[in-house]
């Protein structure tokens, strides 16, 4: 009933002896103004691209970062554009311009002809009346064992 042994496998290779080990992250900007951190890995690969996390990663433009501010405490997102308090009036204007009159439901000109309607399954449909009566009388006679 023995289980397999568990090992702690590090995410990144152990640092070489010649490289100084630093606990803090050192950040620098390249020619394009992109931030790189020394602790992010080899060859300047960003940390979020190097590690195999779920989800897609994308970078925000400076305009997008400026337009959206995230409230860390509540976890809510606030947009830089002011909230329009008159959204109901705008909605009513939009709906009145589209419709022009109140919507009362679907309108039908005529009912469809029976030939256009789909056929119901055979076990839903009753047998023709003549055959049905004969079958019913036979079943009743056999059940009651009465001779006619």
Swiss-Prot record:
Pfam families in the cross-refs: PNRC
Locations listed in the record: Nucleus; Cytoplasm, P-body
Region (Disordered), start-end ranges: 1-69
Coiled-coil segments on the chain, per record: none
Gene Ontology CC terms, in alphabetical order: nucleus; P-body
Keyword Cell cycle: no
GO BP: nuclear-transcribed mRNA catabolic process; nuclear-transcribed mRNA catabolic process, nonsense-mediated decay
Function according to Swiss-Prot or TrEMBL: Involved in nonsense-mediated mRNA decay (NMD) by acting as a bridge between the mRNA decapping complex and the NMD machinery. May act by targeting the NMD machinery to the P-body and recruiting the decapping machinery to aberrant mRNAs. Required for upf1/rent1 localization to the P-body. Also acts as a nuclear receptor coactivator.
Protein name: Proline-rich nuclear receptor coactivator 2
Taxonomy of the source species: Eukaryota, Metazoa, Chordata, Craniata, Vertebrata
Name of encoding gene: pnrc2
């Amino acid at each position: 009933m023995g289980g397999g042994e568990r090992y702690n496998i590090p995410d990144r290779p152990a640092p070489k002896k010649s490289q100084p080990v630093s606990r803090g992250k050192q950040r620098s900007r390249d020619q394009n103004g992109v931030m790189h951190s020394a602790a992010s890995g080899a060859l300047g690969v960003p940390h979020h691209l190097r590690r195999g996390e779920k989800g897609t990663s994308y970078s925000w433009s400076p305009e997008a970062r400026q337009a959206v501010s995230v409230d860390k405490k509540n976890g809510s997102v606030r947009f830089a554009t002011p909230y329009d308090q008159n959204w109901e009036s705008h909605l009513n204007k939009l709906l009145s311009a589209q419709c022009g009159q109140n919507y009362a439901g679907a309108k039908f000109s005529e009912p469809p002809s029976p030939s256009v309607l789909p056929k119901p399954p055979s076990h839903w449909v009753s047998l023709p009346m003549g055959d049905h009566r004969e079958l019913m009388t036979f079943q009743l006679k056999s059940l009651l064992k009465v001779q006619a």
